[in-house]
Amino acid sequence: MAKFKIRPATASDCSDILRLIKELAKYEYMEDQVMLTEKDLLEDGFGEHPFYHCLIAEVPKEHWTPEGHSIVGFAMYYFTYDPWIGKLLYLEDFFVMSDYRGFGIGSEILKNLSQVAMKCRCSSMHFLVAEWNEPSINFYKRRAASDLSSEEGWRLFKIDKEYLLKMAAEE
């Protein structure tokens, strides 16, 4: 399959974006963790101040999924800032449906993300990969990605909403 196109997502793509987010979560054995709704995606990504940006991979009708979907991959990203190195593109989610892997779709999405990062003068692109996800780790390593966990010893932490609320209310 040589025909596909990568394009910025539009508000009308939110149902497909949510579908792919759920497919990625299932692939990562975390499908019960997805709490977002289509409305959240619409408001958060396509309002006056978008919190994220998204590229999607779309195939022509002759290559649609058996369920009739034309959108077969996506990359959700946003910009952040590192006080040591400046602007970063943070790749939050990146997924291509399994039947559409091996056709260059993921590589083309990553190329488009790289172009966005360079256009915005970002110093690098950061992302997380599950330790068990060897196919993705190898995909990124083939493209010169560095594993900061092993190379620099960084650890990722989070503070859940309930504790944020407690801290915010402290006097």
UniProtKB/Swiss-Prot annotation:
Residue positions binding acetyl-CoA: 94-96, 102-107, 133-136, 140-143
GO biological process: polyamine biosynthetic process; putrescine catabolic process; spermidine acetylation
Family matches, as InterPro entries: Acyl_CoA_acyltransferase, Diverse_Substrate_AcTransf, GNAT_dom
N-acetyltransferase domain ranges (all copies): 4-171
Residues binding substrate, per UniProt: 27-28, 92, 126-128, 152
Subcellular location: Cytoplasm, Cytosol
Gene Ontology CC entries for this record: cytosol
Catalytic activity entry: an alkane-alpha,omega-diamine + acetyl-CoA = an N-acetylalkane-alpha,omega-diamine + CoA + H(+); spermidine + acetyl-CoA = N(1)-acetylspermidine + CoA + H(+); spermine + acetyl-CoA = N(1)-acetylspermine + CoA + H(+)
Residue numbers annotated as active site: 140
Single GO MF descriptor: diamine N-acetyltransferase activity
EC number: 2.3.1.57
Pathway(s) per entry: Amine and polyamine degradation; putrescine degradation; N-acetylputrescine from putrescine: step 1/1
Domain of life: Eukaryota
UniProt enzyme class: transferase
PANTHER family: DIAMINE ACETYLTRANSFERASE 1 (PTHR10545:SF36), DIAMINE N-ACETYLTRANSFERASE (PTHR10545)
Protein family: Belongs to the acetyltransferase family.
UniProt function note: Enzyme which catalyzes the acetylation of polyamines. Substrate specificity: norspermidine = spermidine >> spermine > N(1)-acetylspermine. This highly regulated enzyme allows a fine attenuation of the intracellular concentration of polyamines. Also involved in the regulation of polyamine transport out of cells. Also acts on 1,3-diaminopropane and 1,5-diaminopentane.
Protein's name in the database: Diamine acetyltransferase 1
Source species: Mesocricetus auratus (Golden hamster)
Lineage: Eukaryota, Metazoa, Chordata, Craniata, Vertebrata
